[in-house]
Every structure is written in structure tokens, then in C-alpha cells.
């Protein structure tokens, strides 16, 4: 994936974050926001244009990328409101409140109020960068529903969003489409980056 993107002229930085349940989801979101702020401040040293930061993620990474769309975090990390120029979300969860009611919450440790605060679908900005969304055609119903729901919600609020159709990938191999410059997902990503 990184090779195809760098061949197309995109500088790629990979963020690391503490995995759950070692950290809470709120702590992980803070880590990702902090990493973006660090990248913004140090981009020049790595040949990265800090005014063209786009963030993408798959599964939990799709959720974390979407958590960068809200309006409330940038001032706390001393970055411009529009630090993020685009988001790529692959099979992400955008409203995590349903997770409070299933077994996975034993290690997520979420309560309803936290889940609402950590749901990008419930924190839509008045303006925002373009978002490209995709869920694999062989994905489970829940991830497909979350992707379609977030797409519809952004459209309804007049926020720039593009849904990329995919019929042949599942939750685990969808990201491989970014290694193929001929794929619709790669092309949509490059269109967003500009």
C-alpha cells in the first residue's frame, strides 16, 4: 500500500497507538490526535507538506481517522482547525453506541455517554474536509451499515463525502486495494488528495 502511494507522490506516515484493552478508547483517540499534531509540527523535517495532511484507516483505524473530523480537538493540540485535509475510512465504525450492549464492551469499558462522545457520526462539523468511505462487498452487515449510515449522514448535512463501491473484498483485504493504482479505491483516494 505505502509503495503504490509513494510512487504516486504521496508521503506516507504510519501512526502507532496503544491497543485496547491496554488503553481506553478515549486514550487511543487522544494518542492519534497527538500524533497528528506532532506530524503537523515536524512535517518539514520529513519532507511532508503539513498543509496537505490526509488520514486514512481501516476498521478501528477508520473510526480513529473519522474522530479527527470533529471541531473540538484542534485547539487543545495547538493545530489549525483545518489541519486535516481529507479522511479515508475503510470499514470503520462511526456510531459506537451499539458496542455498549455487546460482549466486546467487557474490554472496551464504554458507557453510553462515552460512546456518544467517541462516535464521529454524532460529532459532525459544520464544515469539513472531503471523506472517502468504502466497505468491502464481502464485509459483514454491521460494517456495511455503519459505512452507508455515515455516508448518508454526511450527505444529509452537506459535507463532502464519496462512497466507493466494492464487491470483491472483505474486512481484512479491503486495504490491499490501496496497493493497486488501477483500483477504484486508490483512484478515489488520489482524487481526494489532489
Language-model region placement:
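Alpha/beta-hydrolase superfamily serine-hydrolase fold, recognizing
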Residues: 1-194
Amino acid at each position: 500500500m505505502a509503495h503504490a502511494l509513494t510512487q504516486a507522490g504521496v508521503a506516507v506516515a504510519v501512526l502507532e497507538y496503544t491497543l485496547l484493552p491496554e488503553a481506553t478508547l478515549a486514550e487511543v483517540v487522544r494518542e492519534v490526535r497527538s500524533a497528528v499534531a506532532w506530524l503537523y509540527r515536524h512535517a518539514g523535517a520529513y519532507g511532508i507538506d503539513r498543509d496537505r495532511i490526509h488520514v486514512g484507516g481501516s476498521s478501528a483505524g477508520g473510526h480513529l481517522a473519522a474522530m479527527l473530523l470533529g471541531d473540538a480537538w484542534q485547539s487543545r493540540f495547538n493545530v489549525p482547525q483545518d489541519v486535516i485535509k481529507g479522511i479515508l475510512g475503510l470499514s470503520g465504525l462511526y456510531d459506537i453506541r451499539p458496542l455498549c450492549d455487546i460482549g466486546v464492551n467487557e474490554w472496551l469499558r464504554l458507557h453510553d455517554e462515552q460512546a456518544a462522545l467517541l462516535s464521529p457520526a454524532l460529532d459532525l462539523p459544520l464544515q469539513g474536509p472531503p471523506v472517502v468511505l468504502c466497505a468491502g462487498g464481502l464485509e459483514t452487515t454491521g460494517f456495511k451499515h455503519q459505512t452507508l449510515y455515515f455516508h448518508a449522514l454526511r450527505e444529509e448535512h452537506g459535507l463532502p463525502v464519496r462512497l466507493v463501491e466494492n464487491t470483491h473484498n472483505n474486512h481484512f483485504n479491503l486495504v490491499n486495494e490501496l496497493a493497486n493504482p488501477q483500483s477504484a479505491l486508490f483512484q478515489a483516494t488520489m482524487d481526494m488528495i489532489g
